[in-house]
Amino acid sequence: MSHYCFCGKVTDNPADKLVAAINENRTAHKDSSLFDNPGLACLALQYIKAYQGDCGAVGGSDAKKPPESQFAEEFAPNCGVKASTLARITGRFLGCQTKYIHAPEAFSEILIRNQKSLDILYSKNHTEVGAAVTGTDGGSPYFWCVLFSNGKSNSTFAFEGGVAKPTKPGCYSGANDVCSGAHDWSQVSVMLLFTASVLIAMGFAFPL
């Protein structure tokens, strides 16, 4: 797990850099690169916001996650994604810590921590990916989220009218947006209550 490649051309958006790291390591492993779907990435940002800045809910004995129904009922409308274009989520990474680190380090040190993480990363079930990064209350804690799907490029997770709704604070991939001011992000907004679910320890990847 120590030989990662971070050599691709990316933007100043840390979520784009996270997707670049994922695709570079998939292709180095002889797996196909994934389509960076901004609609799916926006859902990843909404997924983060559902945690309301609570790192303790990401892993450990108090681990929780949003209910699956929230994708169609809350995440998609908040992003302006058509519910009829949602596709199956085939894998997820979620990490949180108090110190901000850049995307390559977040990928290798927080999201890729065990064999299950690698199984998700290299899965042949994925065709699309979307990543999001955000901080809380102008700073710590910081969240990184990646969602994978088996949807069809340019037809799944489509925005109403082809335009995404504003979703600040935070950054998501594929949005052609510069988002380098991680330490200036304002407080994460409140969303619905969680359905309890056991996850892998904080910062680890977790499957469906």
Feature map (PLM): residue ranges:
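A well-ordered secondary-structure block
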Residues: 12, 61-190, 201
